[in-house]
From Swiss-Prot:
SUPFAM superfamilies: Small protein B (SmpB) (SSF74982)
Classification via PROSITE patterns: SSRP
Gene Ontology CC: cytosol
Subcellular locations according to the entry: Cytoplasm
Keywords, comma-separated and alphabetical: Cytoplasm, RNA-binding
Identification of the protein by name: SsrA-binding protein
Listed GO MF terms: RNA binding
Family statement: Belongs to the SmpB family.
Gene: smpB
Cited InterPro entries: SmpB, SsrA-bd_prot, SsrA-bd_prot_CS
Any one GO BP annotation for this protein: trans-translation
Amino acid sequence: MSAKKNSHLVFENRKARHLYDLLDFLEAGIVLTGPEVKSLRSGHASFQDSYVDFKQGEGYIVGLHIPPYNNAGYVIQNPDRPRKLLLHRQELKMLASKVEQKGLTIVPLKLYFKNRKVKTEIALAKGRKLYDHRNELKKRAEAMDIKRELAARHL
């Protein structure tokens, strides 16, 4: 019998890896309602322009769109409401102090189930400029050219 998987990836924010230099990673829980969890299990969510904001010493993920679950009944939820992150007090203080620095933000990278609980991977990030994107693309192209040349030599 095969071992059960403990985590199941629901969504990944690939665009964040392109737009930001990721510095520090953390795993956090999210406070959700039942219909929101069911909507996630059915594969509906969007990370478009989401980030983490701090209010009254608590972390909230803003911009995470979870559409209403079709069979939720009469319960009507705001799909774009801020959702509280479950982090230790020390982690919250550390992140809040780093976000106050100019140019740093916190972005969600992944949304997944771990032991039947919804978790998100968040990262402390610094925004890239347009020329940084171009430099990154040049580096990737050069690396691919080198790989092609090495592969051609070994044949």
